[in-house]
Amino acid sequence: SSNDLNEFTLPVWVAAAAKSATNILNGHKFKDIEVIDLPNKEKSLSVPISSSSLLDNGKKSLAVSHCKSGLSLDVTRGLEVWAYIQFNKITGHPQKTVQNDFPDWLDFHAGYGVGKFESSGEPCLSKFALDLLCINLYPLRPKGFAIKVEIIFPEGKDRALRTSNEAFGVVDGLSLIGTQAEAQISA
């Protein structure tokens, strides 16, 4: 048997780290596996988490996952993913992010090593990546609060130099693209 090798695309590892950090901030014990639900509800995935901790006297949290994409040439293989989480009270006027249709409860920040569009400075992430975050984080949100998510790829900037991202107007790191959960092994 191939023994489920946890070969998922980068958005899955990002959602898993964000979910782990959100659970920790909600007072739950660390689990080294997070279950990630997929947008079409066809199934859920068990995703390994390396570590997670509270920070700043329990006001923030951080979780780390390591991307195993299964493709030996894939620039994301072995990439360390950091997710910082913070809960912020939603005030009377929740602001919508114009470009990427982020819901008002999700305050997404592309941190160091995460690709941004050169033209707008907006984070470069696919609808699939955003949907994964929304589906998996929304149920964990404390009532009346927004979840601030900052994703960091410590090696993202260096690894992006090995991609043609810049030709597509993406700078500063690796883009969070991908339209499916499992890494495709092409023949």
What are these regions (language model features)?
Residues 1, 5-31, 37-43, 52-187:
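N-terminal loops that bind phosphate or other acidic moieties
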